[in-house]
């Protein structure tokens, strides 16, 4: 199989490329710079120069491919909605249209953010599966969630309403961690290297996290089942509690960790105050960054992935305990 990957130097993209090459597939990947192209080539894939706004480059990458894994996305940026729309929504439309035109299967890396993080966490929801719907409120200023929802809607328009019809699967991971992560894991590593970690409450709640290698395994499962279409949660690859995540990550880092438990009733007002300070100091910063972090840390994982296990036959390849320690070791060695 020949597969074109976007976001090939990002967290999920790197794991997808590695998994594809390990089983003998041919891989090309979009590379927006000489450095990115060298990184793609270093992994054993063939770089296609261009970024997510470069329509001819995307067309060239998709042409001749049997399938596309679209993993490129802006997760956190201070550049405003237009930047999110251009990179996450318009670019997804371009990739999906090219895939439909050239008859390539599309695996779109979406997010559980499409459900509306305010509803799933604030509402105390449990067992959020794909029937939950994507019409619930989104935090004001949560450009990432809005853009991922609109991007996925664009995929379904092309799959169900436009010609030629697109063969597509959307994978909805929760917070992704793993080796090479420049978003979440790198921040965890920076904090834990100090030898002190913080948990909200007693830390016994299962976190909404998934290992990048297990997301890649889901992408390959979707590629191998071209008759299956639709959206799938990839948000539960085994339970790992808030406290266990911190302790195992620190173990991988080689750090003796002291864990501080912060009561929930103190964490929320502190996060609200921190958001106010952040917005004053850095105009354009996400409106609810610290409150979103408290929600994520302090609530149990509400998402279930049984549909992916059943229809895609997705099986996580690395258990969480090993994956967290492996991630910590990577950041230890990369320091």
Residue ranges with predicted function:
Residues 35-41, 45-93, 98-100, 116:
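NAD(P)H-binding glycine-rich loop region in Rossmannoid oxidoreductase-like domains
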Residues 3-23:
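N-terminal Rossmann NAD(P)H-binding glycine-rich loop of SDR-like oxidoreductase domains
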Residues 139-169:
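Active-site Tyr-X1-5-Lys
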Residues 115-116, 166-187:
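Flexible, glycine-rich beta-alpha linker
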Residues 150-151, 182-187, 200-223, 229-230:
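Substrate-positioning beta->alpha
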């Amino acid at each position: 199989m020949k597969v074109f990957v976007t976001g090939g130097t990002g967290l999920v993209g790197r794991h997808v490329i590695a998994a594809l090459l390990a089983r003998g597939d041919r891989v090309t990947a979009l590379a927006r710079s000489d450095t990115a192209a060298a990184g793609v080539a270093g992994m054993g894939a063939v770089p296609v120069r261009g970024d997510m706004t470069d329509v001819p480059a995307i067309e060239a990458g998709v042409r001749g491919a049997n399938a596309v894994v679209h993993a490129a996305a802006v997760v956190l940026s201070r550049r405003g909605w237009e930047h999110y729309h251009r990179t996450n929504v318009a670019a997804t439309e371009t990739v999906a249209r090219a895939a439909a035109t050239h008859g390539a299967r599309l695996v779109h890396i979406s997010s559980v953010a499409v459900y509306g993080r305010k509803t799933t966490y604030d509402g105390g929801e449990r067992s959020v599966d794909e029937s939950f719907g994507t019409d619930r409120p989104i935090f004001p200023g949560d450009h990432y969630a809005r853009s991922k929802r609109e991007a996925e809607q664009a995929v379904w328009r092309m799959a169900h309403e436009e010609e030629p019809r697109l063969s597509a699967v959307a994978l909805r991971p929760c917070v992704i961690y793993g080796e090479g992560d420049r978003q979440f894991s790198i921040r965890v590593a920076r904090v834990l290297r100090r030898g002190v970690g913080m948990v909200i409450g007693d830390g016994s709640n299962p976190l909404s996290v998934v290992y990048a290698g297990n997301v890649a395994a889901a992408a390959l499962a979707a590629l191998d089942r071209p008759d299956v279409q639709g959206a799938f949660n990839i948000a539960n690859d085994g339970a790992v509690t808030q406290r266990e995540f911190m302790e195992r990550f620190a173990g991988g880092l080689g750090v003796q960790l002291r864990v501080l438990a912060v009561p929930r009733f103190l964490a929320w007002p502190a996060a609200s105050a921190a958001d106010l300070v952040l917005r004053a100091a850095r105009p354009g910063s996400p409106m609810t960054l610290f409150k979103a972090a408290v929600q994520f840390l302090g609530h149990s994982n509400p998402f279930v992935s049984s549909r992916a296990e059943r229809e895609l036959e997705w099986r996580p390849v690395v258990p969480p305990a090993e994956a967290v320690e492996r991630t910590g070791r990577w950041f230890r060695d990369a320091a």
